[in-house]
């Protein structure tokens, strides 16, 4: 994950939209195995 993607994720996390929050949780669950390496 590069800086630009990380910033996009931060912006996404800070969004008040509940739908985006659920999508973020889904994305996080999918990417956790990669982040644990």
Swiss-Prot record:
UniProt-recorded name of the protein: Gene product 16.5
Q: What is the lineage of its organism?
A: Viruses, Duplodnaviria, Heunggongvirae, Uroviricota, Caudoviricetes
Which organism is this entry from?
Bacillus phage phi29 (Bacteriophage phi-29)
Q: Which family does it belong to?
A: Belongs to the phi29likevirus gp16.5 family.
- Protein keywords: Early protein
Recorded superkingdom: Viruses
């Amino acid at each position: 994950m590069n800086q630009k993607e990380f910033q996009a994720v931060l912006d996404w996390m800070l969004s008040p939209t509940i739908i985006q929050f659920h999508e973020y949780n889904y994305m996080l669950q999918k990417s956790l195995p990669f982040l644990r390496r």
